[in-house]
Amino acid sequence: MLNDGTGFKKVYIATGFTDLRRVIDGLARIIRFQFQLDPYDKNTLFLFCGRRTDRIKGLLWEGDGFLLLYKRIENGSFSWPRTKDEALEIT
């Protein structure tokens, strides 16, 4: 379980649209083959957003299994980058 939300060593934001019907294996495939990153990189959070910007998914490998996060906000929407030019690096 997610014990400490400040312990991420990296956070990657998948720009553009992601089909949020995908679950752990589908999101891990996107990470591996589309972004050429390792989904098993411990304490690295990968974030995805669909066409509806009121919900996002996160995937996190915790060393003993994946944690799939899902957030839907009731009012408003996330300001999600749709292109790499809109994305910022978070340090």
Q: Where on the chain are the PLM-derived regions?
A:
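Polybasic/polar functional segments that serve as interface/processing modules
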Residues: 1-91
